[in-house]
C-alpha cells in the first residue's frame, strides 16, 4: 500500500490530530467506534486499526514499512511498542520535523529527497535514515536551502522542541542528544494496540 496522497482534513476528522501530516485542526466528527459497540469483536478490531492508521498517516509511511518496523521492534530488547515509536521518531524526515525545520513530515521528506539535508557533513537523501545520538543535522550552504529552513524555523519557534533534540538557530544546526523517551512522542497514540493489530502478521 502506497503513501496516502488524498485530502488530509478528511483523515484527521476520522483519526484526530496528526501533527506530522498537517497542522490543521478542524472540528472532529464523532468516531464510528463510539456510535456502534454492539459487536465487541468488530469494535476492538476497529480501535486497533485506527491506532495503526494514526501511525501510518502521522509518519507518512506505507503499510509495508510499518510492518517492517514492527518486526524490527519485536526482535529488539525492551517494550515492542516503545521501540517501535523510537524507530519511527528517529527517522530523518521526522527529526527534521521535530526540530522545526519544516512544519509537516511530508514537507520534511521533500527536503531530504531534494538533497537539502546533511547529516554529520555528507548529504543524506534517504528519509528513512535512522538518526543516532550525537548526529548533527544541517542544511546545504545554498541560498535556496537556507531560505526554506529559515522561513519554517521562524514559524515553528512557538512550538517546543523535544528534549532529545537541540536546534542552534544561529548556526542552523540540529543535534540529536539521545534516544527519546515515551513522554516525548508528539502524537496521542496507544502503541500497544498497534502491536496487537500486527500480532498475527509480524
Curated annotation (Swiss-Prot):
TM ranges: none
Molecular-function GO terms, alphabetical: rRNA binding; structural constituent of ribosome
| A Gene Ontology BP annotation from the UniProt entry | translation
Q: Which InterPro entries match?
A: Ribosomal_uS4, Ribosomal_uS4_bac-type, Ribosomal_uS4_CS, Ribosomal_uS4_N, S4_RNA-bd, S4_RNA-bd_sf
Instruction: Kindly state one GO CC term assigned in the UniProt record.
Output: small ribosomal subunit
What the entry lists under Pfam families is as follows:
Ribosomal_S4, S4
Q: Which keywords label this protein?
A: Chloroplast, Plastid, Ribonucleoprotein, Ribosomal protein, RNA-binding, rRNA-binding
- Subcellular location per the Swiss-Prot or TrEMBL entry: Plastid, Chloroplast
Query: Which intervals hold domain S4 RNA-binding?
Result: 90-153
The record's similarity note reads: Belongs to the universal ribosomal protein uS4 family.
Assembly with partners or alone: Part of the 30S ribosomal subunit. Contacts protein S5. The interaction surface between S4 and S5 is involved in control of translational fidelity.
PANTHER family, sorted: 30S 40S RIBOSOMAL PROTEIN (PTHR11831), SMALL RIBOSOMAL SUBUNIT PROTEIN US4M (PTHR11831:SF4)
According to its UniProt entry, what is the function of this protein? One of the primary rRNA binding proteins, it binds directly to 16S rRNA where it nucleates assembly of the body of the 30S subunit. With S5 and S12 plays an important role in translational accuracy.
State what protein this is by name: Small ribosomal subunit protein uS4c
- Originating species: Cyathophorum bulbosum (Moss)
Amino acid at each position: 500500500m502506497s503513501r496516502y496522497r488524498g485530502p488530509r482534513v478528511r483523515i484527521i476528522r476520522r483519526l484526530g490530530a496528526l501533527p506530522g501530516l498537517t497542522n490543521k485542526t478542524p472540528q472532529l466528527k464523532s468516531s464510528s467506534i463510539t456510535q456502534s459497540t454492539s459487536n465487541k469483536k468488530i469494535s476492538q478490531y476497529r480501535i486497533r486499526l485506527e491506532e495503526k492508521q494514526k501511525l501510518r498517516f502521522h509518519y507518512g509511511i506505507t503499510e509495508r514499512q510499518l510492518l517492517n518496523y514492527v518486526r524490527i521492534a519485536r526482535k529488539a530488547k525492551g517494550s515492542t511498542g516503545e521501540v517501535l515509536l523510537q524507530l519511527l521518531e528517529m527517522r530523518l524526515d521526522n527529526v527534521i520535523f521535530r526540530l522545526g525545520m519544516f512544519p509537516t513530515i511530508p514537507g520534511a521528506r521533500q527536503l531530504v529527497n531534494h538533497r537539502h539535508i546533511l547529516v554529520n557533513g555528507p548529504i543524506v537523501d534517504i528519509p528513512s535514515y535512522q538518526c543516532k545520538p550525537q548526529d548533527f543535522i544541517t542544511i546545504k550552504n545554498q541560498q535556496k536551502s537556507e531560505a526554506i529552513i529559515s522561513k519554517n524555523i521562524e514559524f515553528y519557534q512557538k512550538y517546543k522542541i523535544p528534549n532529545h533534540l537541540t536546534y542552534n538557530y544561529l548556526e542552523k544546526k540540529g543535534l540529536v542528544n539521545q534516544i527519546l523517551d515515551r513522554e516525548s512522542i508528539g502524537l496521542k497514540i496507544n502503541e500497544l494496540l498497534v502491536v496487537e493489530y500486527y500480532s498475527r502478521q509480524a
